């Protein structure tokens, strides 16, 4: 890949300094002065770039690798060509993430779009009653309503709408085109482009002439270190709050219904829809395009396979998949049985046609 102007290389760090900083073992002390400026995949990494491997599947690519160093665990060190030093770590994936963030800090959250001479653009609207702590940046066309409180170091992107009385913590980034209503955000929260936070939930009751709208007077509570992907929507509660727990990461185009409570350090992949009033524990991982029924409980540490349909409670510490979602071993057994039946049917159909 040619020079990337969006994320230019770092001015350079020595391999020995990277190893010392993150507690990794450098396989060749003589390579400690080598300068690393960026990261890249194994197949195209150059001498000033780091790459990483997690399995022996990368062995063939390593034969022609030109990387400045390869991050791996001790069990895979033997795969690394002798001319390339290894950075050995018990958690190579984590180390790669840490080094990447160090080399490319601007890629860790949405960047400023406008070149600004002042912290608050004259093309933005900030209500006189709003309180902005020092260092808040507000880009053009943003609208900040009455009674809003925004913490120090937070960046508000172009075209963002922040409704009245919303509170946003410190060192947050609200990217262009997002809207935040009836919400309280903690510190170090990232909201990506086009996300919608705090609009009313989908609540209706049957009436004599059709559907009657049910009042939605709850809030959205987003705790510290949460990241919300582009075009994701999080509805405010009906009467209670919708809550996103500390450290949870939500991908693009996820729908979270009213009154949902998601625990700490969960991962929710794109296309997931979570219906109202569902409770999700800590450390839960939900694969892409999964549908989650309302008014159910998913326990701590659950893993749900992509494109599943979760219709009832899921016990803590389990792995579920399929439609309807069931324990993974049952799902895999059922799939094997279905495939075997299909093959048998095809075989019989072929014999009949050939007869």
Swiss-Prot record:
Pfam families referenced in this protein's UniProt entry, alphabetically: Hexapep, LpxD
Pathway where it operates: Bacterial outer membrane biogenesis; LPS lipid A biosynthesis
Disulphide bonds in the chain: none
Cellular compartments per GO CC: membrane
Keyword flag Repeat: yes
EC code(s) of this entry: 2.3.1.191
UniProt keyword annotations, A-Z: Acyltransferase, Lipid A biosynthesis, Lipid biosynthesis, Lipid metabolism, Repeat, Transferase
GO terms of biological process kind: lipid A biosynthetic process
UniProt xrefs under SUPFAM superfamilies: Trimeric LpxA-like enzymes
Keyword check for Ribosomal protein: no
Catalytic activity as recorded in UniProt: a UDP-3-O-[(3R)-3-hydroxyacyl]-alpha-D-glucosamine + a (3R)-hydroxyacyl-[ACP] = a UDP-2-N,3-O-bis[(3R)-3-hydroxyacyl]-alpha-D-glucosamine + holo-[ACP] + H(+)
Subunit structure, interactors included: Homotrimer.
Similarity section: Belongs to the transferase hexapeptide repeat family. LpxD subfamily.
Function: Catalyzes the N-acylation of UDP-3-O-acylglucosamine using 3-hydroxyacyl-ACP as the acyl donor. Is involved in the biosynthesis of lipid A, a phosphorylated glycolipid that anchors the lipopolysaccharide to the outer membrane of the cell.
Name under which the protein is recorded: UDP-3-O-acylglucosamine N-acyltransferase
Species the sequence originates in: Agrobacterium fabrum (strain C58 / ATCC 33970) (Agrobacterium tumefaciens (strain C58))
Classification lineage: Bacteria, Pseudomonadati, Pseudomonadota, Alphaproteobacteria, Hyphomicrobiales
């Amino acid at each position: 890949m040619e020079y990337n102007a969006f994320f230019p290389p770092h001015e350079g760090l020595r391999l020995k300094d990277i190893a010392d900083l993150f507690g990794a073992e450098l396989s060749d002390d003589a390579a400690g002065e080598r300068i690393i400026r960026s990261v890249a995949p194994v197949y195209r990494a150059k001498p000033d770039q780091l790459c990483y491997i997690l399995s022996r599947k990368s062995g063939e690519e390593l034969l022609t690798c030109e990387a400045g160093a390869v991050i791996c665990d001790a069990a895979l060190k033997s795969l690394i060509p002798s001319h390339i030093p290894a950075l050995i770590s018990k958690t190579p994936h984590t180390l790669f993430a840490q080094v990447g963030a160090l080399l490319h800090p601007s890629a860790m959250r949405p960047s400023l779009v406008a070149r600004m001479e002042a912290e608050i653009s004259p093309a933005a609207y900030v209500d006189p009653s709003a309180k902005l702590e020092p260092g808040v940046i507000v880009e053009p066309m943003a609208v900040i309503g009455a009674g809003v409180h925004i913490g120090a170091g937070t960046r508000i992107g172009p075209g963002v709408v922040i409704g009245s009385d919303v509170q946003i913590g410190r060192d947050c980034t609200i990217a262009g085109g997002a809207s935040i209503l009836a919400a309280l955000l903690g510190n170090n929260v990232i909201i990506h482009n086009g996300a919608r936070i705090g609009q009313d939930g989908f609540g209706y009751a049957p009436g004599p002439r059709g559907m009657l709208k049910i009042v939605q007077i709850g809030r959205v509570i987003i705790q510290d270190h949460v990241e919300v992907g582009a075009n994701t929507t999080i509805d405010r509660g009906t009467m209670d709050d919708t809550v996103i727990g500390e450290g949870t990461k939500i991908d693009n185009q996820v729908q979270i219904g009213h009154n949902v409570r998601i625990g700490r350090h969960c991962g929710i992949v794109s296309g997931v829809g979570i219906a109202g009033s569902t409770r999700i524990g800590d450390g839960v991982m939900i694969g892409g395009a999964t549908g989650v029924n309302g008014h159910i409980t998913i326990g701590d540490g659950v893993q749900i396979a992509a494109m599943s349909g979760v219709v009832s409670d899921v016990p803590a510490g389990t792995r579920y998949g399929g439609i309807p979602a069931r324990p993974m071993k049952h799902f895999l057994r059922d799939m094997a049985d279905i495939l075997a039946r299909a093959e048998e049917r095809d075989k019989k159909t072929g014999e009949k046609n050939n007869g």
